[in-house]
Amino acid sequence: MYMGVCQIMSGETVVYQNEMNLVPLRKFTSTEIDIFFGLCNKLKEQDVKEVTIPFEELRHLSNYYHRSQKRFVKDLEHVYDKLLSLTYTERSGLSFKKFVLFTGYEVNVDTQELIVSINPKLKHVLNEITADFTKFELKEMTHLKSTYSKNMFRLLKQYKHTGYFKIQIDDFRERLDIPKSYRMTHINQKVLTPIIKEL
């Protein structure tokens, strides 16, 4: 099984609507970001049906190695807890709607599976994508170490066809979840240096 999963991973892509790049992955660790995008990979073009993902496959998709099952299960729980704190917002004038991306999330240690389903109101984020989307190889993302690098990577992938990406500093702070206490010297040292080194 190990070889089959690794072969699958080499060409696995993540595709989603660009609007998901507006949702900062607040407080996610590097490992949790990898798991999240591994889930997005498995849920793409699955409409709203419930998807069962074997632990072993998700571990390989998210480049998750050298950890105990107990730690893996805890990380799966942390991912969903953090996802619940993230909301997807649609605005129209002063009116708005808020949603969470995944409505079902069951970790079954006995069968070694994660069972997950997408919110029907957000199925367009991962399904029937024809325009205004971000696409990247999952393997490229999971080999980055810094959370800032991972988040910048997905933003840059959105703009790969234009050849440039321009952003105001306040938006940059928001999208990369940079602490408000960081001055420009901190941003250069703790955010930009890892990004430049890894990308």
Model-derived features: positions:
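Charged, alpha-helix-forming regions
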Residues: M1-E198
